[in-house]
Amino acid sequence: MVGRGASLCAVQPAVAECGPARETPPLEVSPRKRLPAGLDQDPCSSRPAPEGAGASAEQSHSAGGGGWCRHCHTKLVELKRQAWKLVSGPGTPLRDPCLSTLLLDKLPASGVQPACRPDTESRCDVCTTHLHQLTREALRLLQTPASHEDPNASRGGLAAPSSRDPPGPVGLMGRQPPVGPDRRKATAWPPGPSVQVSVAPAGLGGALSTVTIQAQQCLEGVWSLSRVNSFLPPTCLAEAAVAAVAVADTVRDCAPAAGPERMSKAWGRGAACTTALVTPAPGTSAGGSTGPSAAASFFIRAAQKLSLASKRKKHHPPPAPSTRGTSTYPTDFSGSLQLWPPPVPPCLLRAASKAKENPSSFGKVKVMLRIWPAQGVQRSAESTSFLKVDSRKKQVTLYDPAAGPPGCAGLRHAPTAPVPKMFAFDAIFPQDSEQAEVCSGTVADVLQSVVSGADGCIFSFGHMSLGKSYTMIGKDSSPQSLGIVPCAISWLFRLIDERKERLGTRFSIRVSAVEVCGHDQSLRDLLAEVASGSLQDTQSPGVYLREDPVCGTQLQNQNELRAPTAEKAAFYLDAALAARSTSRAGCGEEARRSSHMLFTLHVYQYRVEKCGQGGMSGGRSRLHLIDLGSCDAAVGRGGEASGGPLCLSLSALGSVILALVNGAKHVPYRDHRLTMLLRESLATTNCRTTMIAHISDSPAHHAETLSTVQLAARIHRLRRKKGKHASSSSGGESSCEEGRARRPPHLRPFHPRAVVLDPDRSAPGLSGDPDYSSSSEQSCDTVIYVGPGGMALSDRELTDNEGPPDFVPIIPALSRRRPSEGPRDADHFRCSTFAELQERLECIDGSEAFPGPQGGSDGAQASPARGGRKPSLPEATPSRKAVAPTVVTSCPRGSPGHDTHRSASDPSKTGTQSEQRVDGSRPEPPASDKTSGGGGRRPLPSPAPPPPRQPEAQGIPKEPGGEGTDSVLRTPPVGMSGQAALPPLLSDSAYLSPSARGRHLERGLLTTTVTLQQPVELNGEDELVFTVVEELPLGGLAGATRPSSLASMSSDCSLQALASGSRPVSIISSINDEFDAYTSQMSEGPGDPGEFPEGTAWAGGSPASSIGSWLSDVGVCLSESRGPTPQPPFSPNSAAGPGPPEFPTPGSSLEESKVRSSECGRPDNPGSARSLHPGEAVATTQTQPGREPWARSPHEVASAQTIHSSLPRKPRTTSTASRARPSRGPYSPGGLFEDPWLLRAEDCDTRQIASTGRAPSPTPGSPRLPETQMMLACAQRVVDGCEVASRMSRRPEAVARIPPLRRGATTLGVTTPAASCGDAPAEAVVHSGSLKTTSGSKKSVSPKGAFFPRPSGAGPPAPPVRKSSLEQSTALTPTQALGLTRAGAPSAFRGEEEARPSGRSDSSVPKATSSLKARAGKMDVPYRPSGHMSLERCEGLAHGSSKVRDVVGRPPRAVPRLGVPSASPPLGPAPACRNSPAKGVGATKPPAGGAKGRNLGPSTSRALGAPVKPLGPVAGKTAGGAVPGPRAAPRAVPGIGAKAGRGTIMGTKQAFRAAHSRVHELAASGSPSRGGLSWGSTDSDSGNDSGVNLAEERQPSSPALPSPYSKVTAPRRPQRYSSGHGSDNSSVLSGELPPAMGRTALFYHSGGSSGYESMIRDSEATGSASSAPDSMSESGTASLGARSRSLKSPKKRATGLQRRRLIPAPLPDAAALGRKPSLPGQWVDLPPPLAGSLKEPFEIKVYEIDDVERLQRHRLPLRENEAKPSQDAEKGPVCISSKLRLAERRQQRLQEVQAKRDHLCEELAETQGRLMVEPGRWLEQFEVDPELEPESAEYLVALEQATAALEQCVNLCKAHVMMVTCFDIGVAATTAVPGPQEVDV
């Protein structure tokens, strides 16, 4: 055994250390030196008993006349050891006579040891044994057949040789690894890698205790070269080796009795066997027992200590084969990994510390070359005659076999020998390389990448019989023979364990195995049998490859089985290998050649954020291990035609791989399934790919070798291009996509691009680098599993109780794009522009979550499955589904929604898709809105869409989501697409399905009129800008009922659905709209049922806690808006504003007026102006007048505002954003949470809108709206990633051209308002509101906020300017300014959120948040912070309150900023404000940049990031600054001067906050409570984190009463990286992600959260993940900040952000605002597209049916309750006023609901007439219990429920009519009618 060790040492000189004396040569060291003499002697004496063996030994030794002395035994051992060392290599035949001669010559001389000093030089003075005799014995032992015997024989027992050996002592039974030859086989590790010391305790006859010392590997040097095999440090390795050698030597040395024979036999057999220590039984030898036992115990202890010191679990010696459990399959890798897992290469663990590698390395494919030795022992000169390897240079030189090596005088040397060819690779494994060496050198870096969130791929390539399968699979006989796959499995789990301990990250590993085999390219799921538990044919019919235009090939429906342990994963490997065609009996060579196995390990990881609110970050990455067949039909190169047209030759396969790796546009044999499979695995630039090319060293295969080497060298030289698939999720997305099809849709993630967690990938993902977004991000889809209560579901709950669901997008905003899941797949990729495609790609995964999975109308069920939030069915589903539904809302993926989203560029598509989308994606949200009842003003048709959304959630209509159904639903029309089918489901399921819910929200948010704007160039992707004129009375619904966010989650869904349903959803114009819609979805739903349902309801319902929080935020915002300080200004502002004044007047209280302003203002001026606006305005107004007070009072006012705001400017978009946000909220870990954000955002937005709508409505309205629109677009885009950018970019133009755009396009409300002069203000208000809604919504959906803050990075800067601007605005119109501030801020928030481009919205919101934050300690941040207050909420509700007010003040500024045409001051000053604020913004932005570090200030940072926003807010705030009152003014001043505000309030925090400003602002945007922006609550992202807190706290009436997520949310900024399965992120997600999710956070989180590493990356990128202090604010802010950063760092956010920023148009406004500096280029770029998008708006009426009942039911209570808290939070003393307000709101709501009911009755009658149904039918079903007191809340709730039910009925009828006649119902815009108004398109 020692000999073996020696040989190993020979193989590995380093092992010499293991010699007896490290300092002296082994031969010179005597065993005594190694061990204390005592030990030596003791062992010797202890062996007397075994001496019986001694006799045998003696006999065997013919040389020794008598027994050899102990010294001679020692000498023998040493000689054997030296002989082994002298053996050249594993392949050297030991029996070679030459070797024997050489050894005889060398051993004696070097073997003379002082210890054995012979009498004479050659004899021992003790026993006179001749040294040569010992030498010959040593050689005999080396060469003895035993050495070649089956290791098991020796393993059977070394004592066996000697019958005399006592059985007990024969503890020699140490397991013997395969003998020399086996070990020598470079490819295998010795079966017994560890030195096993079997000790028979002195007292035990046969009892053996075994100690495994990982020394065999040390001794043998199996891992010597790389030392990767051992976890032990070199010193430990050396010690272990020494100990093992010492033990072995001692054993042999001490067993003279055993004698040479026994030892020789044992030794011979164990040439490579492990060391065995034989301890005689105590009785065996007198006095000898103590020595051996002591020695044995010493070594055992030493070994144990070494093992422990290595800090690695002690690897118990693999039991004898008999002890291993029998495997059901031919192979037993599972048992192997369990018994003797391969040692983890140190380089792997070291790499683990380096979380990531240089991103640049990702573009490169590592190519390694393995030289397979020719069979037989002919690895002689012949093999080296044409192949020379330089391992040091990693080069291989090929000579012409005829010429021979250069310096060789080969017989065939030709005079004109061809020039040798040299090739360099990343690594070369010569013929004698150990399998372990190959595995460690190949797998380590790939595993690191996978664990970090990127995809990884390792595949073998080469001709037949070159060990490809051996390399990949290996053998299960020993750790040294394990192949790459089992090693990767073992090490992956080891790495995961290490990461779990280090980072607390949770992982879930899933395994899938697919095979492409035969000439027919049959695709087989190798785990189908295991998965089904049946013996069904593995020809799993479910597995298929789908070509995805955007994401490339997607492998669908393969089984992914959860593997909690490496053994389980290995078990699946065994099963896959058994199921593989090559394992079948009679499998021929041809079958083997054409068998290609793809074994994939899907790594889902998520980390619960510190906040402990379920906030999680994480994602999915995949490790593809591909065992490629040789493909060639013949042993040679094989012709391509040999196997038929479908058969690829190896050269063809090489060309395919080269093309895929190179990102070539054209891939040969693209239709071949193997090509498709490889594309799915390799074509992602973010995929860490390693190719192991196999060549033969036989000259006979020179041609094959040369061709393989040439191909490998080409691949090695080329660097991965940022392939088209990068953004198309070739890898990640593909993985997502593949998951999409094969996983239940509900488990599908939204586009992972936004969720890359790995910092390296994060940047790319966020930055818009297609490459990065493709693999890592995509593969690392953010997976957030949200439980019913908004609680994050663990993978266990979602899956098999152990792992997270495949994945769910953590970013609802992105998810919103996923809404269209049905037709979406096809439509979704129908893009006229690449940007569009990219956008689709981004949401593909999420949107991919088909309602189907949810299948039922119950989004919840799908959502639960997907979101894992089943419990809160509506909420959970929405939450989970929110991802998809949100996407749906945003852009029904399957349906044109997504397309619309993208088809904006495509006019025809835009029209149709937009329409579809409107009806599919948007309509659904509007329907939801309608259903909410909050949007009573919205025509029933509007509600109809919600049902579609629900179907989407259900998966049936799933208008947006359900591609097929959705299509149909959408087809019915924009106006009423999903209403019919969805209504029922919508109410519940709609919420359930985030997508549905998003839609509902969107619907709720969107007004009837959907302007399908088709700014084609936003992001290069068509963006349908839909303006939903009709605005949901979100406030009304949301206000009362949804205070308790979590509790309401379920209802929230309903509310949301209702809210969404109540209002027709217009497909978000372009991405922005979509984004807004998405955001709005959250916000929208509440909007209609009184924006509150969606927003509030959402906040309350979706994320119950969130809702509370959100409401609080909203409340804060409302309070701010309505708040004492803000109220008056608001009222005046309202008055001042053309539209706002009008509404303000109707609104009893400031808040009411705010709501009015937002709701009415939005519709009134902008709303009216817009086709929908008149009606919408009417609806909104009607709702507003009645509903507004109601909405307002319940804090739904904010919601309403948000909705109105959203509708007017980009209400739809904004609304959508708002709604989307709620959707997101649900989507969030706690759908409730997200919802709350949405709600919050909406609330905030609503307020802001009210405020903006009112105050800024006049002057800032127009300009602001555009900006808002721009912002919104930007935000939306950001949320979507690509889409967001696109939307934004369009939005910017839209913003710039908002007035024209206002036509009802993107900014539904805004557009119209822009149209009219009054509308300009109104629009400003509406737009602002819209923006706010959007912004709020989006902000609320942290992404938006996050995104905006980024765009609104200027936002924070704006605050400083804002001071001046605000003051300016104030000077211009205190009231108006206040209105602007309030309305404007909301507007800005929304707008900003809606379109980053209209930075002001974001600024407003962010600023508001910032203000709130400023209150907390930052003025600039207030604006954003208002939304972000949630984030900063912990900082202080009071702060939030004042901040909110300030935000209210700020909003005007935001409005100006947003208010491209802000009020006159905003307009004139808007630019001025924008400029001034821009400066501030610019200044602030720097802080934002600086604040990045301080993610807490992300809001501010975001604001900074969104200078435009700040400018808007500045204008708004400036105007509102004075008006806002103490809060607004003071805050306005500090807040207004983004810098100043920051400097003032943030003075100390300025830098820090500035850095976080962006994040914060984003968060702020997300948190309506911060500012008077509804969306502030929307900031639920922050909301939960911060926004929710603020809004919720405020809403609750006491800042201290934030939603459950309020505080938690703040800390859970990691949510930003809640990407992967940070399914627990559900809660956090809702909290923080929403703001970021809205637009920014989502994208932001996306980018930051998609990879596991991306978590870290994202954190780094945003600076939020890292900031623990600001974690609360940072959570949302981080995302915001990250987003800002993203904006700042095009590289980081280039892909997502930039794309989203395609909304630069808003930036222009932003630029004007001063935000431009932050996101100048990017954002600026975006504007033109936005403008383009907005240029050609369509008004598409989308009717979304939602569960009005539910919406109303929940919204109302939320509104009332939330309104109260909101007021209280806002006013503080507002507690009383809050009650009054509540009553007022209730009254308003009652009026609105009644008006809506009347309107619905009329519509029902009309619809019945159309359907030829007897009039009056069903009406009795919707009557309210006459016994109820009309003034009571119960009556209102009952009325709302009845109205919701009626609305659903009407929607269903309308949908039916539309489906049958495709007619759009034009509803006369009656301001008195609370229901959403529809404008005929």
Swiss-Prot record:
InterPro entries: Kinesin-like_fam (IPR027640), Kinesin_motor_dom (IPR001752), Kinesin_motor_dom_sf (IPR036961), P-loop_NTPase (IPR027417)
Distribution of this protein across tissues and organs: Expressed in several neuronal populations.
Keyword Coiled coil: yes
Residues bearing the modification Phosphoserine: 30, 1257, 1654
BP-aspect Gene Ontology terms: cerebral cortex development; enteric nervous system development; negative regulation of signal transduction; regulation of cell growth by extracellular stimulus; regulation of neuron migration; regulation of neuron projection development
UniProt-recorded name of the protein: Kinesin-like protein KIF26A
SMART domains hit by this protein: KISc
Domain Kinesin motor, first and last residues per copy: 364-718
Membership in a protein family: Belongs to the TRAFAC class myosin-kinesin ATPase superfamily. Kinesin family. KIF26 subfamily.
Known function: Atypical kinesin that plays a key role in enteric neuron development. Acts by repressing a cell growth signaling pathway in the enteric nervous system development, possibly via its interaction with GRB2 that prevents GRB2-binding to SHC, thereby attenating the GDNF-Ret signaling. Binds to microtubules but lacks microtubule-based motility due to the absence of ATPase activity. Plays a critical role in cerebral cortical development. It probably acts as a microtubule stabilizer that regulates neurite growth and radial migration of cortical excitatory neurons.
Keyword Cell inner membrane: no
Primary location: cytoplasm
Oligomeric form and interacting partners: Interacts with GRB2 (via SH2 domain).
Annotated compartments: Cytoplasm, Cytoskeleton
Coiled-coil boundaries: 1780-1812
GO cellular component: cytoplasm; microtubule
Compositional bias (Pro residues): 940-950
Species per Swiss-Prot/TrEMBL record: Mus musculus (Mouse)
Leader peptide range in chain numbering: none
Keywords for this protein: ATP-binding, Coiled coil, Cytoplasm, Cytoskeleton, Microtubule, Motor protein, Nucleotide-binding, Phosphoprotein
This protein's encoding gene: Kif26a
Regions of compositional bias (Basic residues) in chain numbering: 742-751, 1685-1698
GO molecular function: ATP binding; microtubule binding
Low complexity composition-biased segments: 1084-1095, 1328-1353, 1477-1489, 1524-1537, 1575-1587, 1664-1675
Biased composition regions of type Basic and acidic residues, renumbered to the chain: 818-827, 1151-1162, 1390-1399
